[in-house]
Regions:
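Terminal connector regions
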Residues: 1-20, 97-121
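Short beta-strand segments of immunoglobulin-like
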Residues: 22-27
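Short, solvent-exposed loop/turn segments enriched in Ser/Thr/Gly
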Residues: 29-36, 51
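Asparagine-centered strand-capping/turn motif at beta-strand->loop junctions
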Residues: 39-43
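Short acidic/proline- and small/hydrophobic-mixed sequence motifs that coincide with surface turns
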Residues: 46-49, 63-65
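Hydrophobic beta-strand segments
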Residues: 51-54, 69
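Short aromatic-acidic-glycine turn motif
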Residues: 56-67
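Short, solvent-exposed, Trp/other aromatic-anchored flexible loops in extracytoplasmic proteins
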Residues: 65-110, 119-120
Length: 121
């Protein structure tokens, strides 16, 4: 019965929750921008093949360039035999380093970033 319910607790989803720990460090060169930092898994499940993507935009939000890199995470061997070093366990953090090539005449006005991952057993 509805009247017998004392309380309801929300259960965290059984998934990774990845976030940037701090704003990325950015190094500007003539032909590229290099972003580095760390991400954190605040979820309750491992994130597999985690990578960080950066997008560089001009003043009219036209995409100038983008690139991504896998994180420097934990080494895992999956049941298929594949071995990777870009998994991120719950409560762990990992570093990344992403270089985005641009022309020396590019006028970058906006930068956006995303974290992508997969989930495997």
């Amino acid at each position: 019965e509805k009247a017998d319910i004392v309380s309801v607790k929300e259960i965290a989803p059984n998934s990774p929750i990845l976030s940037f720990e701090v704003e990325p460090e950015q190094k500007i060169f003539d032909d590229k921008r290099v972003f580095s930092g760390t991400i954190l898994n605040e979820g309750v499940r491992r994130a597999d093949f985690a990578r960080v993507v950066f997008y560089l935009w001009d003043e009219n939000t036209n995409l100038i360039s983008s690139d991504s890199a896998f994180i420097n995470g934990s080494t895992i061997q999956y049941s298929s035999g594949i071995i990777t070093d870009c998994a991120l366990e719950p409560s762990e953090s990992a570093s990344y380093n992403v270089g985005v090539a641009i022309s020396d005449t590019a006028n970058v006005k906006y930068i956006t970033k995303e974290i992508h991952f997969s989930i495997y057993e």
